């Protein structure tokens, strides 16, 4: 029996039998939601939900208990309880193979625009767990179940090697400094290149007398004085690893500009800058360093700033909207209409269902915006985003650094997927 026949057979039989949620802990030791969906044929899907530190104000609501006597208010027993009662009852007997129908039930149960009743941390856990259970039922990997025969493009990793901003306790304004292995031919090559640069970066920082402690996402968190010092160190590490800066390994940054914007100016490097002055700083950096991507270059509320930076740099580098779009198809459509950014960061927990996540990806792709699927700073060992990246041909992925197991879990899963695809696998090239 072929795969298609197996899928059709399973779809006519298997139904959702049980939905179970529980409270577990993420990589920062904070509670998060884990969901298991069990089907009538014994198939199981399990998903644990991440949480962000730098959160866009338009994101769907992450519901927490607020009880200061337990986990300093970070508990998630409220969304867990709602999954185990309201959601579980409503999904019992439903087919797991119609993802849009499942997600419409979740949206109807919540009934709010921002998932504030059930919590996006509950709905995304259920939504993804249903998809994983369906894939398990038909006996194929999630990326094949979601993407079919066209799912063969491996994402290029943007690897966070130096942390700053809200992700580290240091002096750096910018949140992430990343290396991008643009010269790689396969994902395995990309992983090797990034690992070798990461090793060398540690040596370089130690010789300079800097700490090699790591931040939330596994990157080093040295007390370098300013952002350009970081770029200098990264270029040095790349070249001392035997690679060429630019043609082998390029640089990317997540500025997270909303975190140092006060509504009128940007408090950057000890100065108050206008949008235009901050853009001029970016232009200078791009002219001096092999930077190919800047994420959240402007605050999500600084729409005129976004228009200006896109006009001035949009034909030179990738300008990624995270807080600007928060994985919301409507906000992406608005960005396209107003020529804001040219790439979209996708975080499934920002929007709250798999269907809406895929809709956001397709909306971006239809309008020739690049797509980068992303982890969060508070992560788990869950590897679902690796499968979505390949299934939807996202092209790029952010999963943190080459330390901390919750970060490497995604990279390791991509190595397995590339092996599974064999010679049909292709590595996306951002240049």
From Swiss-Prot:
SMART domains: Enolase_C, Enolase_N. The active site is at residues 217, 347. Its main location: cytoplasm. Pathway: Carbohydrate degradation; glycolysis; pyruvate from D-glyceraldehyde 3-phosphate: step 4/5. It comes from the Bacteria. Mg(2+) binds at residues 254, 295, 322. The keyword Transit peptide does not apply. It catalyses: (2R)-2-phosphoglycerate = phosphoenolpyruvate + H2O. Keywords: Cytoplasm, Glycolysis, Lyase, Magnesium, Metal-binding, Secreted. GO terms for molecular function: magnesium ion binding; phosphopyruvate hydratase activity. InterPro entries: Enolase, Enolase-like_C_sf, Enolase-like_N, Enolase_C, Enolase_CS, Enolase_N. GO terms for biological process: glycolytic process. (2R)-2-phosphoglycerate binds at residues 175, 347, 376-377, 398. Its cofactor is Mg(2+). Its EC number is 4.2.1.11. GO terms for cellular component: cell surface; extracellular region; phosphopyruvate hydratase complex. Binds a second Mg(2+) ion via substrate during catalysis. It is found in: Cytoplasm; Secreted; Cell surface. This is Enolase.
